[in-house]
């Protein structure tokens, strides 16, 4: 069901509309109810700051990164009517503790699953294109976070801030996050990627980074559902046997699994069949390994172009960190459970914006990724804050106006030959270097 249909369903019985009711149109109340029950926090008690309002304050922490949590709740006007118009800071702290992080996690996962199953996406050779990659977030430096998440270390001990390691599964053509998993810095990305297996949809191709080469993980991935394929760059030291050659640059190969891998993954066979494809870009050779062993369904010419789309998940991480999070290095929350809650709220806020962008491009000859995320984000925030709510029947009209506005923010075509090396500029020195000793200066 699209967001506009939620407007129609609610408008028949919303007479005296509150701001919280307007926000419920964007995030289906049924999803919230299921998430609260699943997390065991649902209650029949009527509070002035109900769980739905606390959920929106957690989402608002990402939409209004430079505002305090107290200001966010008051600007969104999410508390129910009462004697006091403003929400006390202590009430928000207690509300976040009542909400917990699992209810926000379930809300994110339910919304992502419902959106993917009801929307249509661009496909490649009949498969939905997905991507998996990891990213880290920095937390406040305190003992609780160090014990929960850990940090990098060197010969002198632990350094830097505690960090959360995250691994995400994303639909490429829309940047919609299907699921995420995060844990301590001590947990590797491949272990986190295994937790994403239940979210892998049928008829999909997942693009991995080179670091995810694990035959146990890849075997589980391709057997997770119907036509669940994978692709990643081949290592330089890859050991294989050629089963047969499709052409000089395209081969079906046999990969041998190690005893250690078979011990860790009980269902892993001694050998796996894969496809090794070689192609050139600007005179440089590249090799990709995949489970797409049918050359008739997946022609060589198509395989040489698809892997470049893995970079879309890097762009999505940039949108989250630089766009929503305003390039802030450290998350707001100071306790481990609240850090987890804030991260799930950040992913949920990102998906809500992406879902609205999906609605804006529906039945249009443009992709959601062709719209400017930063401009769309500002318009969505303005919709939440300034849309008049005196009449429920007007809400679908305002929402249509929002979608029309988003369609104006079409990005220019990407340059095909652009090149951005992974380097950083040298920072200028704040103070001049002292090149002579004090005795010479005197």
Regions found by a protein language model. Give the residues of each.
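Phosphate-interacting basic helix/loop segments used at nucleotide- and nucleic-acid interfaces
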Residues: 114
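Single, function-defining residue in the core of a domain
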Residues: 1-69, 84, 96-99, 106-108, ...
């Amino acid at each position: 069901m699209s967001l506009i249909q939620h407007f129609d369903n609610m408008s028949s019985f919303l007479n005296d509309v509150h701001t919280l009711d307007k926000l419920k149109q964007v995030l289906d109340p049924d999803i919230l109810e299921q998430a609260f029950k699943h997390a065991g926090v649902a209650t029949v008690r009527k509070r002035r700051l109900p769980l739905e309002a606390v959920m929106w304050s957690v989402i608002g922490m990402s939409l209004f990164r430079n505002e305090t949590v107290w200001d966010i709740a008051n600007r969104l006007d999410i508390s129910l009517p009462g004697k006091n118009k403003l929400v006390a800071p202590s009430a928000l702290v207690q509300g976040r503790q009542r909400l917990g992080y699992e209810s926000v996690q379930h809300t994110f996962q339910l919304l992502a699953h419902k959106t993917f199953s009801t929307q249509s996406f661009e496909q490649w050779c009949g498969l939905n294109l997905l991507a998996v990659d990891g990213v880290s977030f920095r937390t406040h430096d305190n003992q609780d976070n160090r014990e929960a998440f850990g940090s990098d270390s060197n010969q002198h001990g632990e350094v830097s801030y505690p960090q959360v390691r995250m691994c995400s599964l994303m639909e490429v053509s829309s940047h919609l996050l299907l699921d995420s998993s995060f844990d301590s810095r001590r947990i590797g990305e491949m272990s986190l990627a295994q937790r994403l297996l239940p979210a892998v949809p049928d008829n999909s191709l997942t693009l991995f980074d080179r670091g995810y080469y694990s035959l146990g993980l890849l075997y589980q991935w391709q057997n997770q559902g119907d036509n669940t394929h994978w692709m990643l760059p081949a290592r330089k030291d890859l050991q294989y046997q050629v089963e047969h050659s499709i052409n000089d640059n395209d081969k079906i190969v046999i990969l041998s699994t190690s005893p250690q891998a078979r011990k860790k993954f009980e269902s892993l066979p001694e050998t796996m069949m894969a496809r090794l494809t070689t192609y050139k870009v600007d005179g440089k050779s590249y090799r990709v390994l995949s489970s797409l062993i049918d050359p008739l369904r997946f022609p060589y010419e198509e395989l040489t172009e698809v892997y470049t789309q893995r970079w879309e998940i890097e762009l999505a991480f940039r949108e989250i960190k630089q766009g929503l999070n305003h390039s802030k290095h450290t998350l707001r929350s100071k306790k481990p459970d609240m850090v987890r809650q804030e991260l799930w709220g950040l992913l949920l806020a990102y998906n809500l914006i992406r879902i609205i962008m999906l609605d804006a491009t529906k039945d249009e000859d443009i992709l959601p990724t062709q719209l400017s995320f930063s401009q769309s984000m500002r318009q969505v925030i303005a919709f939440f804050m300034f849309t008049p709510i005196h009449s429920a029947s007007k809400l679908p009209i305002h929402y249509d106006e929002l979608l029309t506005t988003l369609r104006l923010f079409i990005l220019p075509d990407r340059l095909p030959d652009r090149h951005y090396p992974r380097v950083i500029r040298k920072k200028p020195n704040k103070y001049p270097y002292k090149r002579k000793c004090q005795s010479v200066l005197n």
